[in-house]
């Protein structure tokens, strides 16, 4: 047991100076699974790491292992279906499909314009992802109309929208 405490550290501790950042894409099925856990994650984060920073990209990175975009899409949809079943995430098991382009634009507008912050924003983010991935386009359209009529874009450091290539959701410290 004394060896454990005296052994050399193999990796430097991660710095938390910049907090915790998650990169998402609205049309990425792994992002859909990840946002279902963000509320719980935020509750257990220490105050030193908060607020959780969220970066939403509209650009997909190149698929891995020389896969085509179609092969990657099919693979990720099947993989996410298995993960969702194993971990009890919400997921369309009948016929999972990517959200349509109009719905993606509406979802981004809703998220850009909402004044909600912290945990309330995370709840909205999860709801918007559910609407996208469960093809609840009527609900999404209603929120979109409200957002465009009553809100303006919010510029918050913990919420950013950009075009950096993201293949699948990931965290960065």
Residue ranges and their predicted role:
Residues 33-133:
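Structural alpha/beta surface segment adjacent to cysteine/selenocysteine redox centers
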Residues 27, 73, 103, 163-166:
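Aromatic-acidic/polar surface patches that form glycan- and anion
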Residues 1-8, 19-20, 31-43, 116-173:
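C-terminal cap of thioredoxin/glutaredoxin-like
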Residues 15-29:
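Short active-site neighborhood of thiol/selenol oxidoreductases, capturing the structured segment around
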Residues 25-26, 67-68, 160-162:
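Short, contiguous strand/loop micro-motifs
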Residues 7, 17-21, 59-63:
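Generic signal for short, ordered secondary-structure residues
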């Amino acid at each position: 047991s004394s060896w454990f405490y005296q052994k050399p550290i193999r990796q430097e501790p991660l710095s938390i100076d910049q907090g915790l950042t998650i990169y998402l894409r609205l049309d990425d099925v792994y992002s859909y699974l990840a946002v279902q856990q963000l509320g719980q994650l935020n509750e257990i984060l220490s105050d030193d790491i908060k607020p959780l920073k969220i970066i939403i990209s509209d650009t997909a990175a190149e698929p891995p292992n020389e896969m085509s975009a179609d092969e990657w899409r099919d693979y990720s949809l099947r993989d996410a279906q298995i993960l969702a079943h194993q971990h009890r995430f919400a997921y369309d098991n009948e016929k999972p499909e990517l959200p349509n382009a109009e719905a993606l634009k509406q979802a981004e507008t809703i998220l850009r314009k909402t004044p909600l912050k912290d945990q309330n924003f995370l709840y909205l983010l999860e709801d918007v992802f559910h609407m996208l991935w469960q093809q609840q386009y009527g609900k999404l359209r209603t929120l979109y109309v409200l957002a465009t009529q009553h809100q303006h874009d919010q510029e918050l450091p913990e919420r950013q929208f950009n075009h950096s290539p993201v293949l699948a959701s990931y965290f960065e410290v």
